[in-house]
Amino acid sequence: MDSVNDSLVILDIKYWTNHNNKKIFDKNLMKFLKKDYFRKIPSTKHKDLPAIPFPNYHVCSNVKCSRLFDLRDNFVMSDYLKGGPKCPDCSRKSYPARFVVSCQENHLDDFPWRWWAHGKQDTECKGKLRLWSTGNTSSLDSLYVECECKKKKSLRGAMQDSSFENYKCTGNHPHKLNEKSNCNEPVIPLQRGASNVYFPALRSAIVIPSNASEDNNLDDFFTSVKEVINTYADLIGENWHYKFYSDRLTGHSEFSDAEDFIAKWTSYLNSNDSEEEIEYNQIKEAEYRAFTAFDRKVKMGDFEAEVETVPDDFQPYFNRIVKAHRLKEILVLLGFMRNDSPEPDVNEPKKIVWLESDGYENWLPAIEVHGEGIFIEFNHTTISKWLEENSELPKRSEKFSSLYASWIESKGWEVRDEKDIVYVMLHTFAHLLIKQLSLQSGYSSVAIKERIYCGKNMAGVLLYTGSTDQEGSLGGLVEMGSIDKLRPLIVDALEEAIFCSNDPSCASLEPSEDNQLNGCACFACSMVAETSCETGNRLLDRSLLVKTIDSKYSPFFKGLL
């Protein structure tokens, strides 16, 4: 992370001291991730997060000096806080070195400058290092690192894995402070600011209040005081609830007396004592039910939505259109990976570096995103009919499913959900509509996110945006959900997808690993920012929606355009 004067790494959550930050509760997400609660990430200037400089090696900005030094040598915190890193030779400002090294086990450490300068050999030499530039070109060939002992080497090849065959990983995790593990993996050179240095592992859920807001509030209350209640029960024994009620709950609006409290506490325990694991798809199923269960309007806590009338010409394709005036998403940071993206949609993704709390409490950092959205449920009957009438679709569906399964297995992950042609159709529709909405709603396509609901008895998409501000977003997106505005948006999005500026090349693409598991799709027609997409711009095919110049089957929206 770049700061004003330096590059920093935020320390693991066990080093955080902000224990007064708000606790966040979501029963399904907590059970899915096996956590007691989540804690809100501090966002004000009065609540800092602990961080350290990284990389440790810095370069003097004075080109006549160009000292390459380890900041940890003779480090003085007061001087560092005043003006950032300074050269130990000439006291000029210094900047963090451009290169670092990582490995497939997600370790991260400084580039081995001394090893490199001495001909890629281990050495006992402690001479001063300098990073010189010949100034001839901007390539690495023009840079070389030189030791005081006169050993020197050009940085040519410094970004090639093959240059580090004799150098093994140090097992370092800079965010864990002096914790190193034994690791013999070969290192991978990286640019310090490259996107593959850090891939966050995130899980999220749309908060769906229960039918009774009182029950929802009680769940949160009991979850927050569960440890205190257990302490009372252990210390006092029988009839502990009378003491707890008199000490802490007298006058509490949710409980009339101690007997009412113990009855509701017992009910809470009975509803939360299941040891059964929750899959991520079950969280989505609960969200899907919430969007499809009410008749006209619903307003419960942070969930406020209303149904739009589906026009006659849309009814063969859509069962329901919902304007979500108010949504709350809980976004949890599990940990991270380097060099590759984390495993999707599972509660314990493999190979990620998990954030570790201090041992006394089992939590993860999270943020609450308040926003708005548009939910569209597809017509299940039409989907079934479309699949039955096109003999080529089962083959294409199997192609997508097998490609996705092979990709998951190649990563060493477990195949949990089948991504068939219905998912690809829904996913592509979401992308096309995001691109069109960004032109009309006032939000860029980067700000609009998708949630795809596909599975048994599920076929829908949620497009939403939000902000960490309690007031949420500005209403521009949900306004586009009004049918008089949404109808032309959908039609325009589909018409734009018929032709691509990369046709005929794009239209002839077949599903393949070389094309990111996509069929007829590219950045010109179907792809959006990866922060908006559930699957990293994979599993897209516009030919499933509209007739392209190379279509081999009837598209889903055949009769609409």
From Swiss-Prot:
Knockout consequences: When this gene is missing the DISARM system does not confer Nf, phi3T or SPO1 resistance in B.subtilis.
Keywords: Antiviral defense, Cytoplasm, Restriction system
Superkingdom per UniProt: Bacteria
Keyword Cytoplasm on entry: yes
Gene Ontology annotations of biological process type: defense response to virus; DNA restriction-modification system
Broad class of where this protein is predominantly found: cytoplasm
Protein name: DISARM protein DrmB
Organism of derivation: Bacillus paralicheniformis (strain ATCC 9945a / NCIMB 11709 / CD-2)
Species classification: Bacteria, Bacillati, Bacillota, Bacilli, Bacillales
